[in-house]
């Protein structure tokens, strides 16, 4: 189903670029994703209900999403017609990936053993942008006492691990190779 969601996201992304609505559509899609992310199971039930017609699913879209961008509404109609309303979170994720790629930015999760100061965060973000060659990094911070010290950054599939725990694991591996 991820491939299906990617196709919807790509179509919406292309339309948003062609019509100079990329920012608006991204913002509205973010709000929609937040609104439905806890309702995916209910949406799956709507998708799988054989007694519900496409028109009824469209009415549901109209009732819930009254004042949204017409391109998003059209995509939602297509999702409803094809019994894919529950894919909206996957569509959002794929759209976000295209959006981030367009602007050469990505999300980063910075883990540390304590709450980092703004100065420390700025230094880490600068390091991450240099290492990943991204224009912008959107940061989410988490406290992880298992790191013992230092920090670990996850950007997409890349992990930059400057934690004491990682140093100890690396040291342990070296000792095992020697013995």
Swiss-Prot record:
Pfam families: OSCP. Coiled coil: none annotated. Keywords: ATP synthesis, Cell membrane, CF(1), Hydrogen ion transport, Ion transport, Membrane, Transport. GO terms for cellular component: plasma membrane; proton-transporting ATP synthase complex. It is found in: Cell membrane. It is a peripheral membrane protein. One of its GO terms (molecular function) is proton-transporting ATP synthase activity, rotational mechanism. F(1)F(0) ATP synthase produces ATP from ADP in the presence of a proton or sodium gradient. F-type ATPases consist of two structural domains, F(1) containing the extramembraneous catalytic core and F(0) containing the membrane proton channel, linked together by a central stalk and a peripheral stalk. During catalysis, ATP synthesis in the catalytic domain of F(1) is coupled via a rotary mechanism of the central stalk subunits to proton translocation. This protein is part of the stalk that links CF(0) to CF(1). It either transmits conformational changes from CF(0) to CF(1) or is implicated in proton conduction. NCBIfam families: ATP_synt_delta, PRK05758.1-1. F-type ATPases have 2 components, F(1) - the catalytic core - and F(0) - the membrane proton channel. F(1) has five subunits: alpha(3), beta(3), gamma(1), delta(1), epsilon(1). F(0) has three main subunits: a(1), b(2) and c(10-14). The alpha and beta chains form an alternating ring which encloses part of the gamma chain. F(1) is attached to F(0) by a central stalk formed by the gamma and epsilon chains, while a peripheral stalk is formed by the delta and b chains. PANTHER family: ATP SYNTHASE DELTA CHAIN (PTHR11910). Belongs to the ATPase delta chain family. This is ATP synthase subunit delta. The lineage of its organism: Bacteria, Bacillati, Bacillota, Bacilli, Bacillales.
